[in-house]
């Protein structure tokens, strides 16, 4: 199983090639250079954030596409799409990271085959909890729960992380506003 999208290729000292717009390329180039040069937190905080990013998504309009199909016959390649999505405003207890590597785990597969339930129902319920949570009730859902990358922005309630921190993200859910802010 896999989804392939035009990739930005980068190797230190080798320059950049793109499969996306020049503006996006410049955005990623600046992040990669900051990492490579050991930039401090202030330099990461000063980076301009792109208005959109490329993401693997499932679509609300397709959540019934596997109705009546046995689980073993549901093919995630049919439901996962790669598209540009708006970069969200971060909530006080959230961080914005530039993902440098990600993986597929059981949550990704379940989301892509809409089992055991469609995540769109859970996101709609979450949206009723607060104005910040409402931002997640969209016509698409960005999938993925395991990643590594670098922190670009932190919400006002985040205390243990700062722009420039290199992090690993896992699928357990912890609040960034909690006493123990967990990112592995």
Question: Can you annotate each of these PLM segments?
Answer:
Residues 86-103, 117-177:
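Glycine-rich beta-strand-centered segment in the early N-terminal region that forms part
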Residues 57-59, 113, 151:
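Residue-level signal for short segments within beta-strands and strand-turn junctions
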Residues 56-57, 168:
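Residues in well-ordered beta-strands of folded domains
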Residues 107-111:
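Cytochrome P450 core scaffold surrounding the K-helix E-X-X-R motif
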Residues 1-27, 31:
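C-terminal glycine/acidic-rich active-site capping loop/insertion
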Residues 179-184:
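Short, compositionally biased
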Residues 34-46, 63-101, 106, 140-142, ...:
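A short N-terminal beta-strand-loop micro-motif at the entrance of redox/enzyme domains
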Residues 49-56:
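Short structural boundary motif marking the start of a folded domain
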């Amino acid at each position: 199983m896999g989804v392939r999208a035009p990739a930005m290729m980068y190797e230190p000292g080798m320059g950049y090639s793109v499969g996306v717009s020049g503006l996006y390329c410049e955005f990623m180039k600046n992040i990669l250079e900051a990492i490579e040069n050991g930039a401090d937190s202030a330099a990461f905080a000063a980076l301009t954030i792109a208005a959109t990013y490329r993401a693997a998504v499932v679509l609300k309009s397709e959540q019934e596409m596997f109705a009546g199909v046995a689980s073993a016959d549901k093919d995630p390649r049919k439901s996962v799409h790669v598209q540009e999505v708006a970069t969200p405003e971060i909530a006080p207890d959230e961080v914005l990271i530039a993902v440098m590597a990600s993986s597929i785990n059981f949550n990704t597969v379940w989301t892509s085959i809409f089992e055991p339930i469609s995540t769109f129902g859970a996101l709609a319920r979450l949206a009723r909890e607060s104005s910040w949570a409402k931002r997640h009730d969209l016509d698409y859902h960005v999938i993925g729960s395991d990643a590594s990358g670098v922190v670009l922005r932190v919400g006002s309630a985040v205390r243990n992380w700062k722009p420039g921190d290199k992090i690993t993200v896992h699928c357990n859910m912890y609040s960034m506003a909690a006493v123990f802010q967990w990112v592995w």
